[in-house]
C-alpha cells in the first residue's frame, strides 16, 4: 500500500453530490447574475400597438411628447375633414354640371312652339298647366311641370358654344335658390334666380329685372359655371381666355332672356364692379331699383351706371326701356373686399334689329371707382366723359 496516495471516497447508495455554483461572469456579482436570470422576457408589441403608441399619448410620455402627439392628431383630423370637404365640393359641382344642368337642358327646347310639340307630358298635365298659366310658351311646359318656380331661361353665346345656358328661378326670398338647384336640392352651386321683388306675371316685367348667380366656374368640370363668366365682360383677359379686354364683349354683345311668356334679346351696354361694404367706400344700391316712377329717376340710374362702367358701347337707352341686370360675386382684391360684377343689358325694342356695332365699343380707362378700388388701382375720376347722347331721354 502506498501511504502517500489519497484514499478513494466511498459513496453509499442514494448519495448525491452537492451542487456547485457557476462563477458569475466577469464584472458581475453573484447577486447581479441571479437577478438577471429572474427577469421575465418582454413580449413583442404588434405593429398596431406600436402605431398607437407612436400617435396617441400613453402613460409614461413626457409632457412635451404628449403635446406633440396631440398637436399631430389634431392636424390629421383637420386634414381629413378638409380633404373630405374638398371632395364633397368637387362632387357637388360635378353633379350639378353633368347631371342636373344636363337633364334640365334636355327638357328645354326653345324651338318647340306648339302644344303638340310637348311630347313628354300627358294631355291631362298639359291641360292642368294651361289652367294655371294660360299664356305659357309650350317650350317651358315640361320644365314648369317639374318645378313651378321657373320664370325664364338665360343664355349667353351661340347654341354650339354657350357661355351661360340656364333656367331662371324665383322664390319668396333671395335666399332659397342661393343654395338649391332646379330640383330644390341643397347644393353650393345654387341656381340662377330672379330677385323676389321682380314681376313676371303674364309677361309684364319690372323696369329693371335683376338676376343673381354664383361665380363657381371650374374649367376641369366643364358646363355652365353659373354666372362665373360674366366677369369676362369686366376683363376678357382673366385667366388668359382672351388677348384683349373687349374680346369677350365683341363676341357676346347680346343676351337671350326668355320668360314663360315671351322670347327676347337684350343688348349689353355696361359692366360695373360694385362694392358691398361701407368701410371700403360707397355702396351703390344697384339691385334695389326695380321700377322707375319718372324719367328723371331712370336717367339718374343710367347715368350712375355708365359713370362706373368699364365698358362703353353703341347701345342707346331711353325712359321706358326694360333693363336686365346680371349680378355675380367677383373678388379682384381678395375675399376681404366683398365685391360684385354686374352686367347691364337693354331689351331689344319692337321692330329694332338685335345687331350691335361692336366696332364702336371702348374700354373706359377712368370709371368712377369706390374708395378702396381707387386707392389700389389709382386714377382720379375726371368727371363724366362718356357720350351722354346715347341716353336719349337725358
Where are these regions (language model features)?
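Extended hydrophobic/Leu-rich segments
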Residues: 48-51, 55, 126-129
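Acidic/proline-rich low-complexity IDRs
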Residues: 50, 78-79, 120
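Hydrophobic membrane-insertion alpha-helices, especially the h-region
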Residues: 69-89
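N-terminal targeting leaders characterized by basic, low-complexity, disordered sequences
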Residues: 1-52
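Juxtamembrane low-complexity tails/linkers enriched in Ser/Thr-Pro and polybasic
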Residues: 52-64
Amino acid at each position: 500500500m502506498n501511504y502517500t496516495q489519497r484514499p478513494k471516497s466511498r459513496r453509499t447508495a442514494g448519495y448525491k453530490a452537492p451542487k456547485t455554483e457557476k462563477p458569475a461572469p466577469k464584472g458581475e456579482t453573484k447577486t447581479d447574475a441571479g437577478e438577471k436570470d429572474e427577469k421575465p422576457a418582454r413580449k413583442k408589441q404588434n405593429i398596431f400597438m406600436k402605431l398607437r403608441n407612436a400617435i396617441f399619448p400613453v402613460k409614461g410620455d413626457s409632457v412635451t411628447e404628449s403635446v406633440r402627439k396631440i398637436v399631430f392628431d389634431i392636424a390629421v383630423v383637420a386634414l381629413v375633414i378638409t380633404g373630405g370637404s374638398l371632395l364633397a365640393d368637387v362632387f357637388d359641382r360635378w353633379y350639378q354640371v353633368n347631371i342636373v344642368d344636363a337633364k334640365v337642358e334636355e327638357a328645354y327646347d326653345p324651338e318647340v312652339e306648339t302644344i303638340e310639340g310637348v311630347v313628354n307630358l300627358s294631355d291631362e298635365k298639359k291641360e292642368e298647366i294651361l289652367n294655371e298659366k294660360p299664356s305659357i310658351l309650350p317650350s317651358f311646359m315640361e320644365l314648369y311641370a317639374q318645378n313651378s318656380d321657373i320664370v325664364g331661361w338665360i343664355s349667353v353665346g351661340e347654341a354650339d358654344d354657350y357661355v351661360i345656358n340656364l333656367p331662371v328661378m324665383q322664390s319668396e326670398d333671395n335666399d332659397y335658390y342661393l343654395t338649391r338647384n332646379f330640383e330644390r336640392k341643397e347644393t353650393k352651386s345654387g341656381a340662377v334666380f330672379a330677385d323676389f321683388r321682380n314681376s313676371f306675371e303674364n309677361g309684364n316685367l319690372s323696369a329693371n329685372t335683376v338676376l343673381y348667380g354664383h361665380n363657381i366656374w371650374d374649367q376641369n368640370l366643364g358646363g355652365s359655371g353659373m354666372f362665373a363668366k360674366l366677369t369676362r365682360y369686366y376683363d376678357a383677359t382673366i385667366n388668359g381666355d382672351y388677348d384683349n379686354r373687349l374680346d369677350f364683349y365683341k363676341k357676346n354683345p347680346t343676351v337671350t332672356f326668355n320668360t314663360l311668356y315671351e322670347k327676347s334679346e337684350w343688348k349689353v351696354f355696361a359692366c360695373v364692379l360694385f362694392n358691398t361694404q361701407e368701410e371700403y367706400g360707397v355702396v351703390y344700391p344697384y339691385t334695389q331699383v326695380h321700377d322707375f316712377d319718372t324719367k328723371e329717376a331712370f336717367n339718374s340710374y343710367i347715368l350712375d351706371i355708365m359713370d362706373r362702367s368699364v365698358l362703353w358701347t353703341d347701345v342707346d337707352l331711353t325712359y321706358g326701356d326694360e333693363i336686365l341686370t346680371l349680378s355675380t360675386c367677383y373678388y379682384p382684391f381678395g375675399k376681404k373686399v366683398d365685391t360684385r360684377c354686374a352686367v347691364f343689358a337693354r331689351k331689344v325694342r319692337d321692330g329694332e334689329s338685335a345687331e350691335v356695332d361692336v366696332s364702336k365699343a371702348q374700354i373706359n380707362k377712368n370709371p368712377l371707382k369706390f374708395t378702396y378700388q381707387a386707392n389700389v388701382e389709382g386714377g382720379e375720376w375726371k368727371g363724366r366723359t362718356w357720350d351722354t347722347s346715347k341716353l336719349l331721354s337725358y
